[in-house]
């Protein structure tokens, strides 16, 4: 189906405390939808210059968690944030089997074509970094630079990291989480909780369990592990239904390590020194991708651009300059 673009304009006022360095005080947004082969993909654009598309994690989150932290990049680049299929403001699908990395690669390509981006830069964070790797394997000729943030090239290796994260928990927390997981994580609690994690599990797993690996230096004061902003049907299909510390949905097929050497474009890999996606994973990608650059941010968890916003922005600008 022909890719169609529907747009509107609005203005977003920036936070005065976004960064200590000077930046524009008003960020103009173009927003709209691209019909990506029958699936409506939401996007937002800021700035002008060479295009930099940014893809989020989850899977099943949205681009919102990047804002306002990445907005200073619009001084030099045309930023394109998308919500992946089934996420954020993009279209939810009845057939959950359509939630795959491969289909999302085609969505990214459809947005690139529809917006006339030509050869673009691509940044992926967390699961978005998995998507960015997959896009590079298929459409490398359409990329100028690749930026892989706090991500992993292998689900089996990521699952080994989760084992270590659990081992480092207090015995009491680990026992609580294991008990909830063994009883099944869905179909419990109040009616509105039965198709997602209960608040009790989210607070234990995302709050107590993950928090030290999300933030180190500068925790987001609004972080709420019980907030319900996910696309749960997508999450269960891709991540799985057996908890936060094992990926056993369709993402279990992600094993890219032996293909990383085929990425020949300039590539930046970064993560936090206490990242949920352990630095060893970024070091492996750096070793396998020829000529790649590696930055490990100090005093930083998974949300590197929150913990170290100035360092993060500078590293991206230096790499793309």
Language model regions located:
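Short beta-strand/loop motif that positions the catalytic acidic residue
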Residues: 263, 269-271
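Catalytic active-site module of serine/aspartate enzymes centered on a nucleophile-bearing elbow/loop
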Residues: 292-321
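Alpha/beta-hydrolase
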Residues: 179-258, 265
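Conserved HGGG/HGGXW glycine-rich cap/lid loop of the alpha/beta-hydrolase fold
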Residues: 39-92
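Conserved hydrolase catalytic core segment
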Residues: 118-161
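Conserved alpha/beta-hydrolase "acid-adjacent" motif
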Residues: 276-281
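Flexible "cap/lid" loop of the alpha/beta hydrolase fold
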Residues: 147-191
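Active-site loop/oxyanion-hole signature of alpha/beta-hydrolase fold enzymes
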Residues: 84-127
């Amino acid at each position: 189906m022909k890719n169609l673009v529907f747009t509107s304009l609005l203005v977003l006022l920036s936070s005065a405390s976004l960064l200590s360095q000077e930046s524009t005080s008003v960020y103009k947004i173009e927003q709209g939808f691209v019909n990506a082969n029958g699936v409506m993909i939401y996007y937002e654009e800021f700035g002008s210059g060479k295009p930099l598309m940014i893809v989020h994690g989850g899977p099943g989150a949205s681009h919102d968690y990047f804002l306002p932290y990445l907005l200073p990049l619009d001084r030099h680049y045309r930023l394109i944030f998308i919500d992946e299929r089934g996420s954020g403001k993009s279209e939810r699908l009845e057939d959950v089997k359509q939630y795959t990395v491969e289909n999302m690669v085609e969505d990214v390509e459809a947005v690139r074509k529809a917006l006339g981006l030509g050869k673009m830069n691509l940044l992926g964070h967390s699961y978005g970094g998995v998507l960015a790797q997959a896009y590079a394997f298929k459409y490398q000729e359409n990329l100028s630079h690749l930026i892989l943030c706090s991500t992993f090239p292998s689900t089996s290796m990521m699952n080994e990291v989760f084992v270590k994260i659990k081992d480092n928990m207090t015995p009491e927390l680990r026992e609580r989480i294991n008990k909830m997981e063994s009883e099944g994580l869905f179909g419990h609690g109040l009616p509105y909780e039965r198709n997602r994690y209960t608040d009790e599990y989210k607070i234990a797993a995302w709050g107590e369990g993950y928090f030290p690996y999300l933030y180190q230096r500068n925790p987001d004061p609004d972080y709420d592990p019980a907030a319900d902003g996910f696309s749960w049907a997508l999450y269960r299909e891709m991540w799985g239904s057996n908890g936060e510390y094992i990926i056993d949905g369709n993402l279990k097929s992600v094993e890219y390590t032996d293909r990383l050497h085929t990425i020949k474009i300039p590539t930046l890999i970064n993560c936090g020194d206490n990242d949920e996606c352990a630095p060893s994973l970024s070091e492996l990608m750096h070793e396998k991708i020829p000529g790649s650059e590696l930055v490990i941010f100090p005093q930083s968890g998974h949300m590197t651009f929150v913990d170290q916003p100035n360092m993060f922005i500078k590293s991206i600008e230096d790499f793309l300059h």
